[in-house]
Amino acid sequence: MNTAELLRKIIRRENLTEDEARSIANSVMKAEVPEIVTAGFLVGLATKGESVEEITGFAKAMRDNALHINFPSALDTAGTGGDGLNTLNVSTAVALLISQVYPVAKHGNRAVSGKSGSADVLEALGYNIIVKPELAEKLIKESKFVFLFAQLYHPAMKNVANVRKTLGVRTIFNVLGPLTNPANARYQMIGVFSKEFLPKLAEAVVRLDYDRVILYNGFPSLDEISTQGITYVYEIEKDKIVSYTVSINDFGLKDEIPVSKLTVNDATHSALRILKAFKGKDEEARRFIGINTAMALYLIRKVKDLKDGYEYALQLMDSGIPHVRSLIEKNGDLSNFNKLVEKID
């Protein structure tokens, strides 16, 4: 089926097969079709609603066109973003903490709609975000942490960047980042911008051959575990999917923290709040990071439940600042980090 026939199929609101989606995604990322056709596919899919097969096919195509490192046992904590709430970079904080006890290949990018992306906050801390594959494998083996910058590891995405920017609306590519980790990480925490998208993404995860993944969407449509209200969770192990909800009570906590108290102005502010939380000088941020770290510890089976996970997370935060310093010493510049630490002390 040629490109025009596939486009007509979408216009008729018919779903593409996984192979059809993979084929057109490869053509798009290799710039084999005009930008106007790419725009037609992206808008058509968004209007129709992306199917499980289409998400899976596009994710496999992104993997086909990516640079890779070999570390499938790693954990990633990348979310979809796009919740518009401008909270501190909790998934990056979790990645830094977990790397004290388990290898983390943190896949991420600069902010698109928010105040600070994972690349931005790591850069604000002084970490070198441009890490090529050979060095990346060395770092994760030696220090249990590496950042895999999406712009570097997905060079073919430059061929759709202009279309995405011009359209200015959410497309299928917004949900693909977490599904395309360059280390082929088989353990993953994925925050999702909408709870309605969770079942569909869970089915795609099953098709993409992970070992264990936890998807979640917290109140109020936050792509993190929330300190306020209910968080919807989908836990996937191989081909088994279990869904449930959690609240702060499941972590052994009582008082909710409004999400409005967890916002940041920019990447430097986010970095500062993370370090303050590690130091015990920002209680709201500490709890937010703590419950998300607890879920990650549960995912990688370091704890039996979320209450134990939260207690363990507090211990990891207590040693968080020296650990982050050691990561930056290996791959970065301590100037920014030291200035931030001075502001805390």
Swiss-Prot record:
Keywords from the named record:
Amino-acid biosynthesis, Aromatic amino acid biosynthesis, Glycosyltransferase, Magnesium, Metal-binding, Transferase, Tryptophan biosynthesis
Give the residue range of the signal peptide.
none
Cofactor note text: Binds 2 magnesium ions per monomer.
Q: Its quaternary structure?
A: Homodimer.
Which cysteine residues pair off into disulfide bonds? none
Which SUPFAM superfamilies did the record assign? Nucleoside phosphorylase/phosphoribosyltransferase catalytic domain, Nucleoside phosphorylase/phosphoribosyltransferase N-terminal domain
| Organism of origin | Sulfurisphaera tokodaii (strain DSM 16993 / JCM 10545 / NBRC 100140 / 7)
What is stated as this protein's family in its record? Answer: Belongs to the anthranilate phosphoribosyltransferase family.
Entry's NCBIfam families? trpD
- EC no. given is 2.4.2.18
Q: In which pathway does it act?
A: Amino-acid biosynthesis; L-tryptophan biosynthesis; L-tryptophan from chorismate: step 2/5
Put simply, this protein is called: Anthranilate phosphoribosyltransferase
Residues the record lists as binding 5-phospho-alpha-D-ribose 1-diphosphate? 79, 82-83, 87, 89-92, 106-114, 118
The protein's GO terms of the molecular function aspect are: anthranilate phosphoribosyltransferase activity; magnesium ion binding
Q: Which gene encodes it?
A: trpD
Domain of life here?
A: Archaea
